[in-house]
């Protein structure tokens, strides 16, 4: 059986890299295959999106949408991730679990504007969770496992206002 470290291109199927601009004897000296003068002969080649004076495509298309400065971004946590943390001993079954506990356990990197509990996967451990938002499926699954979910509904940014 062929090993990955033994793979090689077929003999004669590849060429070596051509070093350009190294004298007339090389066949690729002086202008190094770039022709004579002009923008394309210079380093950096073309200006991205420039179409020779024609209105570029990105400017012909209409503007669309906007960036909402008040948009809230939630750290999402799935049920399987919580169960994984319990099995690894990072969270205790039956304990109260806050957002700070999730960060400390490495379940989420940081809080962002809040934590949203999602229902992907299964949870067998009873946890008393306090989150900013949760899906119906996630709440039902946690309660079926003997735990509870407290939804505060006020994200960090909204609470400050």
Swiss-Prot record:
GO terms for biological process: translation. It holds the Pfam family Ribosomal_L27A. The keyword RNA-binding applies. InterPro entries: Ribosomal_uL15, Ribosomal_uL15/eL18, Ribosomal_uL15/eL18_sf, Ribosomal_uL15_bac-type, Ribosomal_uL15_CS. Part of the 50S ribosomal subunit. It comes from Caulobacter sp. (strain K31). Residues 22-36 have a biased composition (Gly residues). The gene is rplO. Belongs to the universal ribosomal protein uL15 family. Residues 1-41 are annotated as: Disordered. This is Large ribosomal subunit protein uL15. Keywords: Ribonucleoprotein, Ribosomal protein, RNA-binding, rRNA-binding. Binds to the 23S rRNA. GO terms for molecular function: rRNA binding; structural constituent of ribosome. Gene3D superfamilies: 3.100.10.10. One of its GO terms (cellular component) is cytosolic large ribosomal subunit.
